[in-house]
Structures are given as structure tokens and as C-alpha cells.
């Protein structure tokens, strides 16, 4: 089975572009690949999903223990002909100035061969020096081959023999520069896949242009299929419906989190806060993931019926979990990207506003101060934050600590609520079971 991780010396090298080109090409070849993303990024898996038509999954060694990551990888790679994982940032870049949770650590944990994406612009033999450093920085590096990105055929033919002689690594192919296939970005990274109307055409052109020695790559990356691992939790029969917001405004939900909720006994009922006038019927819980509500603040405010329904549900004690953008939606008002302020659901105090910069960015550890729907007092969970918007009322039911000992308070928690900026990774934790139990209890005692 072909299994490999696509990494690069630094961010901005074209990992997502190359990964999507490779996935599309593998799909065309009838290989039936599956896709993974190293780290907590929500957007890159959307592009993988567009290339394959199936879910891509996150693997994060800060948010999850190594055994959990191995179990998730085995679960989602099962039955596929190839597994392709996209790295994050530079190959060795992890939490702070360490390799923790880096692409290299993920490759090391899963014993994955690494295909290194290199952009040759502005350098020649210096590339070989850089590659030697990457090969020697940690042992084993797991790097088995090189792919040149934004590279012409002529330059590929010139550089390939030199790089192979200097590094001992095969240069397995190249992807030429395609100006018409550039994927635009915004304040949280790339635009989402759903916002690019001609994405399928772009992916097709990338796959057409990709030059790759597939036979050589298959030999370099052939590994035994991952052994079946015991499930993180024994799957339960669906026992309660949980409403999950899913549309352009709320699109940051991990596929693994949704599967963990299903495994815990939830039937997921998806709805759109942009378009639906009511919550799904017969629900015992509500999950509002993150996303880009600030881009759609006007449209969200205009859906008066749903805003009222969510406010009423909150007052009735409907078990609710809201992360980042979902948390902003529960507030009183939200400043849109047009700088206008719009009413939101009003379940919580506070007004969301644009700070113009990243706020509390990165990994952190969040500790509960008291028992609540999802947490026990003193319980600590790894989380991450990534947002430019903030709230005038962030809550104080949790204490949060970053690696450099920076601390702050955040979040609202009660017997029926979790709401705050931190994104949670539910798989492999007690959160899904606790949320489902709260939903069951709500329905049992409703009315």
C-alpha cells in the first residue's frame, strides 16, 4: 500500500497544491486514496475532500496521544489503496521552537515515508545543501524522495542529476507553475474549497500538469497496510439526535469529532444557520462549530426565526457546545467584515469584534474550574485557537495556559453548555459520551 507524507522545508512551498494534484492523479489511476492532514488545520482537508469526494482527516500529536493518532490513521486508511498525508508548516516545525506535533514527528510516529516538496526558484546547488541539512537534522528523517514545485521541465532536467548526486535522494517528479490554478487566501489562510467556483477544473489542470514517476514512488512508499486497531470507544446504537450547524459560515468541524459523536450514540442532524428557519426536530443537543460567521454576519442576522429558535433553546437548557465562530454566534452582536455590527442569537453576553490581528494564536492547555456538561473540575484538555475576532465577554470558567506560561481565562460552562474560543478535538476523549448523555437527559426530562 502506498503511504506517504508530503512535507516541505517551510510554509508557502505549495504543499496543499501538490497534495491535491497527487490525490486527484491517484484517483484517476483507480488507486482509491485517502487523505490526512497533519495538525489542526480545517481548510486544507476541505481541498482534499474536493479532490477525492470523501472526508479527509486530521492527525495532531498535540491534541491527541500517539496511540490515538495511530488508531485514527488505521481506521481511516483501512480499505484504501493509498494514504496521503499533508504536512504543516516546515517539516520539523512544531509547538514553539520544538519538533513536537510537527510533520516529522507524525511521520516518525506512523513510520511514514516523506516526499519533500521543494521550490527551486532563486537557488541551485544551495538546494542540495538545504536538503542535506533536512536529512541529517533528525534520525531517521524518513525522507525518501523530492518533488520540485513551480518548476519548468528544463529546470527539472538540469537540477535532477545534481540533486540526486548531492543528496542520494531520487527526484521523483515536478509540478510546473500554473498561474491560473493559484488558490486565493484570506485572514485565516486559504479560502475554503466551497468558495472557489472553478476548483474542480483547477484540480484537474494540476493533475494534468503533474509529472511523476509513479513506479518509483510506489516502490519508495510501499508499506504494509496499518494493522487494525481497537476502536477508541465501543460504538453505540444511535439514541439521540444532535443538531450540527454546517454551511459556509460554520465549516470548521473535524470529521473525527463527528464520528466520535456518532460512536457515542448520536444521530447527527445537519442544518444551516444561514438558510434554515428552524432547528431540526426532536433534538437533544446542539453543536455549533467554528468557521467564518464574520463573513456572513448580515445573512445570519437576517435569519431572525432561527436566531430566536436558538435563543429559546438556550433558555430551555438545550445541551449546547459552541467553538470559536459558534461561540461568536451565541453572543449579542457581531461585527462583520464590512465593519457593521449585526445582532446574533443573544444566548450569551458579549459583542464580537475585529481586532485586525491574530488573537491568542496556537496550541494551549485548558483546565476546567468546575464540573460542567463536558468537563470535570480540574480536568485539562489540549486545545487550539486561531482567530482575528474577539469578544467583549470571553467567559471565565476555564483557565488556559500556553507553553511560555502565558495564562488567561475563557469560556462559559454549565450543566448544559460549553462555549468559548478554544477549538476542541473530541476524538479519543470523554467529551462525546458526556455530550450524548446530557442530550439524553434533556430529552428524558423535557416538558
Spell out what each predicted region is.
Residues 1-2, 235-241:
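A short, charged/proline- and glycine-enriched loop
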Residues 2-110, 118-142, 150, 154-157:
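ATP-dependent carboxylate-amine ligase catalytic core
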Residues 5, 84-86, 115-117, 147, ...:
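Structural motif
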Residues 37-38, 171-179, 267-275:
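Beta-strand->loop->alpha-helix junctions that form or flank phosphate-binding loops
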Residues 107, 236-238, 250-263, 267-268, ...:
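C-terminal and late-domain segments of enzyme folds
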Residues 124-234:
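Internal gly/pro-rich beta-alpha loop/helix module
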Residues 238-315:
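Phosphate-binding active sites in nucleotide-utilizing proteins
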Residues 293-371:
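Cysteine-nucleophile active-site neighborhood
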Amino acid at each position: 500500500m502506498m503511504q506517504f507524507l508530503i512535507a516541505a522545508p517551510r510554509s508557502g512551498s505549495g504543499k496543499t497544491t501538490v497534495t491535491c494534484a497527487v490525490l486527484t492523479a491517484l484517483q484517476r489511476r483507480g488507486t482509491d486514496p485517502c487523505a490526512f492532514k497533519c495538525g489542526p488545520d480545517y481548510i486544507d482537508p476541505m481541498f482534499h475532500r474536493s479532490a477525492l469526494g470523501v472526508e479527509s482527516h486530521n492527525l495532531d500529536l498535540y491534541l491527541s496521544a500517539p496511540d490515538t493518532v495511530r488508531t485514527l490513521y488505521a481506521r481511516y486508511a483501512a480499505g484504501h489503496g493509498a494514504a496521503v498525508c499533508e504536512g504543516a508548516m516546515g517539516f520539523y516545525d512544531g509547538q514553539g521552537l520544538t519538533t513536537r506535533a510537527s510533520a516529522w514527528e507524525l511521520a516518525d510516529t506512523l513510520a511514514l515515508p516523506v516526499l519533500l516538496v521543494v521550490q527551486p526558484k532563486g537557488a541551485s546547488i544551495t538546494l542540495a545543501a538545504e536538503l542535506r541539512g533536512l536529512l541529517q537534522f533528525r534520525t531517521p528523517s524518513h525522507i525518501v524522495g523530492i518533488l520540485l514545485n513551480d518548476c519548468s521541465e528544463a529546470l527539472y532536467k538540469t537540477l535532477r542529476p545534481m540533486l540526486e548526486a548531492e543528496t542520494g535522494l531520487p527526484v521523483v517528479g515536478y509540478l510546473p507553475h500554473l498561474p491560473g490554478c493559484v488558490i486565493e487566501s484570506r485572514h485565516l489562510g486559504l479560502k475554503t474549497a466551497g468558495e472557489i467556483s472553478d476548483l474542480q477544473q483547477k484540480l484537474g489542470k494540476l493533475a494534468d500538469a503533474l509529472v511523476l514517476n509513479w513506479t518509483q514512488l510506489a516502490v519508495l512508499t510501499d508499506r504494509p497496510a496499518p494493522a487494525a486497531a481497537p476502536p477508541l470507544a465501543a460504538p453505540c446504537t444511535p439514541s439521540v439526535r444532535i443538531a450540527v450547524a454546517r454551511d459556509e459560515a460554520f465549516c470548521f468541524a473535524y470529521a473525527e469529532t463527528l464520528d466520535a459523536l456518532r460512536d457515542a450514540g448520536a444521530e447527527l442532524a445537519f442544518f444551516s444557520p444561514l438558510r434554515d428557519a428552524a432547528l431540526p426536530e426532536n433534538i437533544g443537543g446542539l453543536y455549533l462549530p467554528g468557521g467564518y460567521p464574520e463573513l456572513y454576519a448580515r445573512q445570519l442576522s437576517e435569519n431572525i426565526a432561527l436566531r430566536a429558535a436558538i435563543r429559546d433553546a438556550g433558555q430551555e437548557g438545550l445541551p449546547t457546545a459552541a467553538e470559536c465562530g459558534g461561540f461568536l454566534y451565541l453572543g449579542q452582536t457581531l461585527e462583520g467584515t464590512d465593519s457593521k455590527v449585526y445582532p446574533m442569537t443573544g444566548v450569551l453576553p458579549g459583542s464580537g469584534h475585529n481586532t485586525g490581528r491574530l488573537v491568542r494564536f496556537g496550541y494551549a492547555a485548558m483546565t476546567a474550574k468546575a464540573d460542567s456538561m463536558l468537563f470535570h473540575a480540574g480536568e485539562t484538555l489540549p486545545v487550539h485557537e486561531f482567530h482575528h475576532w474577539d469578544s467583549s465577554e470571553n467567559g471565565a470558567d476555564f483557565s488556559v495556559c500556553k507553553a511560555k506560561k502565558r495564562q488567561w481565562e475563557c469560556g462559559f460552562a454549565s450543566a448544559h453548555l460549553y462555549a468559548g474560543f478554544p477549538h476542541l478535538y473530541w476524538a479519543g476523549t470523554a467529551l462525546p459520551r458526556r455530550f450524548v448523555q446530557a442530550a439524553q437527559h434533556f430529552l428524558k426530562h423535557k416538558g
